[in-house]
Amino acid sequence: MYKKVYVETTNNCNLNCDFCIHNERPKKFMNIDEFKTVLEKLKNHTKYLYLHVLGEPLIHPNINKFINIASSSFNVNLTTNGYLIKRIKENKNIRQINISLQSFDEKYQKSLQDYMNDIFLSVENLKNTAYISYRIWVKNKYTEEILNILSEKYNIMIDETKSKNITLEKNVFLSFNEEFTWPDLKNKEACKTGKCYALKDHIGILVDGTVVPCCLDSKGTIKLGNIFKSNIEDIINGKRYQNMLKGFSNNKKCEELCKKCNFIK
């Protein structure tokens, strides 16, 4: 059983951030029947769904329906850039919401204070039934301003040099991360050796049903199968899947994309 499965309900996004990898796949929204098919095939394979890979999940017109349907059998988690968080502020069927504060930029014609205030208003509702995790990069150009706003809101001194994970109040947390580079075949090779939690711990399902090893295969480079055409068991027993598993168990990266990934140690 997987610890979690990433399900991309859409690869559309309301932003165009410099740090995000460019989406080269056809833009699509998963429909309700497709989503139900994914859920049915994931039963007995995981208890935790993460409704994101590429794109902004809250842009999906049926996001609340998806959350409510999935919550009957799974613990639902999602990551959002925060701009559309009002759309789920009344939803009580979410286990955890990760808010990527590094997504803020003045080019989106909204002030930082207004952006944060909108998030705070929604978090006041959501924190009663969900864990809230603010995520921010240590060296983002707005980090200092954002931390000042958070510090004032939660009446707490925030020092990222002392702790990378801070409890702001009950069910509300702040995590610091370093900016990462999306693995891409165009990137310089990082290393040919290494082990990874992909396939053992988790898999990803793209909006068109393509099954990939992890949430960082945003382009669907390593196609292991398609959830709409095959069962999970058949995909797991597939040659490419098994070759990757065997490689990782021997500290070897079999796929070219994995060799370009800095997350694999």
Where do the protein language model's features map onto the residues?
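Conserved alpha-helical substructure of the radical SAM core
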Residues: 1-96, 108-113
